[in-house]
Amino acid sequence: MQKITVLCVGKLKEAFYEQAVKEYEKRLSRYCKLELLELPEQRLGDEPSEAEIRQALKKEAALVEQKLPKGGALIAMCIEGQEMSSVALSEKMQQFAARGASQLTFLIGSSFGLDEDLKKKADLRLSMSPMTFPHHLARVMLLEQVSRAYQIEAGTKYHK
């Protein structure tokens, strides 16, 4: 069974997001071993400078590096990443598995995104949309798409 790690910078605060995450954890349990890791987001003032943002992203990246699972494939969620359909994501996940990646790690950055050096280490940069979403919602959307990807692979009727 493949292991999926979703590593997020920032914690869920609203109960409705937590409920949605729990629902997708339940759905995914038949397809993979899911691990959700949350790391603290660096606190910045209301109008941080570019230098302050870069410094915060570097600090967050250092924490991420400590928690990244060894081996497997790293998928960085970022707006400039590749957009793909649900079917294409399912195929990409299958390709990673066929190449021996028994573990996939999806990385969701803080509200300021991800450090550039961290993105360069990713095997895939993935974008959900050119639109901007709250990171808490992005987590739910990612879990839904991972669930859908497994169901596409299994040939269930969920995906239409």
Model-derived features: positions:
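N-terminal beta1-alpha1 ligand-phosphate binding loop
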Residues: 1-28
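General small-molecule cofactor/ligand-binding pocket signal
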Residues: 7, 35-37
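Short glycine-rich anion-binding loops that position phosphate/pyrophosphate groups of nucleotides
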Residues: 12, 79-82, 110-113
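A generic structural motif
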Residues: 29-35
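Short, well-ordered alpha-helix to beta-strand connector turns
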Residues: 32, 71-72, 122
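S-adenosyl-L-methionine/SAH cofactor-binding core of RNA-modifying enzymes
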Residues: 40-102
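Structured adenosyl-cofactor binding patch, chiefly the S-adenosyl-L-methionine
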Residues: 112, 116-160
